[in-house]
Regions:
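Alpha-helical and His/Cys-centered functional microenvironments
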Residues: 25, 44, 365
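Acidic, Ala/Val/Gly-enriched low-complexity intrinsically disordered segments
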Residues: 3-6, 12-15
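Acidic/polar surface patches and capping/hinge elements
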Residues: 57-448
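Bacterial N-terminal signal peptides that target proteins for export
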Residues: 32-43
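Short, Lys/Arg-enriched N-terminal segments with co-localized hydrophobic residues
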Residues: 13-33
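Bacterial N-terminal signal peptides
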Residues: 42-51
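Short N-terminal alpha-helical targeting/association segments
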Residues: 6-9, 46, 412
Length: 448
């Protein structure tokens, strides 16, 4: 993460694709080659590509049901929590059969010749059915279609039963975990120095304060990784530097933020759960991961994402620090002579409705980046992320590139100060480190 006050050029580190074109020399060469091919050869190659992609997806129900889970839960507050329930159920169901990794929930074993495909489908279906009974008809139709693709034999029957057990155990394990609880949170109606208030344009109430009190999946408590270094003192030079940085770079009418930096900021305003897990599913397909490894990857990433979110929300509602959209128009009340107020200042994009410190994208991205590095054993992981906000695609070649871009995106957007991002990434890294040490580990050295 950046340590000095400077504006990097993250675009030099990533490829950006828009309207189907990737701006790189490789893509240009590929375009000329494809134009030189005969139409018949092109059609054959395209058909083969589609067939291979469909085959890869059909053979990996873990990937398919991660998408189904996301679609099912997408409009429900705490989407990532439900996704984690489903991914853990699939992970435990598959591991009950092949026993390659530590199970997350209570240990149980099924026949080794049981169908892992049926187990994963059954586990995901039963978990979603429990949490989303109103969507029974749609889920039933998707389940019937998926399970029909598996031959009717004892292996299938055993797999279905194992999936049912895994789902029931995860549901029982997470009973009364605080999801959706009524947690009161009071905040001022008018600006006070350093204190969060509802922000324009919607002035929405604080989002999901109950997440701050949830029982985590791997942390000992929601506050285990509460940052020791809280927000900067309002009278400090550090506060003045960071205030003026986001004031300059994050303004809706900034004259110093480049078009490339604006695109980065807006790219990262898309729904982070949908954005990240779309990339993770494609990564599993691109790497040709087995069902077992796909289940482990998605379980690790979803737990890291969710626990980082729980720790982050706990810190947000503990410190309750003000956003730039509140601080900058009220710079004259913070007691710092170097923070000149601008009553007309607005950020590039609407500010999310929850306290500023620490940065949620820092917490989540830090946890995700380190978990990817731990899973693959290297920071050099190539993957692509699509943004529904900008309809552009960014390709990363290392997890460090992802972290750098996500870091600066929140400053360019006018959402966060530098210290908040530093502490957010630190929290996410700590979550990922503990997860990797204590959970989802191979039973044998050659099972990585």
């Amino acid at each position: 993460m950046p340590a000095i006050l400077e504006i990097p050029l993250p675009l030099a580190e990533t490829e950006i694709t828009t309207t189907g074109q990737t701006f790189s020399g490789t893509n240009l060469l590929r375009t000329y080659i494809m134009k030189a091919l005969s139409l018949r050869l092109f059609v054959l190659i395209a058909a083969l590509s589609i067939a291979l992609t469909q085959s890869a997806r059909a053979s990996n129900p873990v990937v398919d049901w991660n998408q189904i889970a996301l679609t099912t839960a997408l409009t429900t507050p705490g989407t990532q929590i439900y996704l984690t329930y489903v991914n853990l159920a699939m992970y435990d169901a598959v591991n009950a059969i092949d026993r390659r990794y530590q199970q997350y929930g209570p240990e149980f074993h099924g026949p080794r010749d049981a169908s892992k495909e049926a187990a994963a489908i059954s586990a995901a279906y039963q978990t979603l059915l429990y949490y989303f009974p109103a969507q029974t008809a749609a889920l039933q139709a998707q389940y019937d279609s998926a399970i029909a693709g598996i031959p009717d034999d004892q292996a299938k029957a055993s797999g279905i039963a194992i999936g049912q057990i895994a789902a029931a155990r995860i549901v029982a394990l997470r009973a009364n975990d605080g999801r959706g609880a009524s947690v009161p949170y009071t905040y001022p109606a008018a600006p006070e120095p350093g204190v969060w208030i509802a922000t324009p344009p919607a002035f929405a109430p604080p989002a999901m304060p109950w997440v701050a009190q949830m029982v985590p999946f791997t942390m000992r408590s929601a506050s285990q990784f509460l940052p020791v270094n809280g927000p900067p003192d309002l009278g400090s030079r550090q506060w003045a530097r960071e205030y003026n940085e986001v004031k300059l770079l994050g303004a809706v009418n900034s004259t110093v933020r480049t078009p490339a930096q604006t695109e980065i900021a807006l790219f990262w305003t898309a729904n982070p759960v949908a954005t990240y897990f779309g990339a993770f599913r494609q990564l599993a397909v691109d790497r040709h991961l087995s069902i077992s490894k796909s289940a482990r990857l998605l379980a690790m990433l979803s737990v890291a994402f969710t626990d980082a979110g729980i720790g982050c929300w706990n810190a947000k509602y503990h410190f309750s620090f003000w956003r730039p959209v509140t601080a900058i128009p009220n710079g004259d009340i913070d007691g710092n002579p170097e923070t000149e107020a601008d009553p007309t200042w607005l950020p590039l994009a609407p500010t999310p409705p929850h306290p500023e410190f620490p940065a949620a994208h820092g917490c989540a991205t830090g946890a995700i980046a380190k978990t990817l590095e731990n899973f693959f054993g290297t920071p050099d992981v190539k993957f692509t992320i699509n943004s529904a906000a900008t309809h552009t695609t960014h390709t990363y070649y290392t997890v460090g590139q992802l972290e750098t871009e996500a870091y600066w995106a929140r400053i360019y957007a006018g959402f966060h100060y530098r210290h908040s991002l530093n502490e957010g990434f630190r929290l996410g890294h700590r979550v990922a480190k503990q997860l990797n040490q204590d959970f989802f580990q191979p039973r044998h050295a050659d099972d990585h």
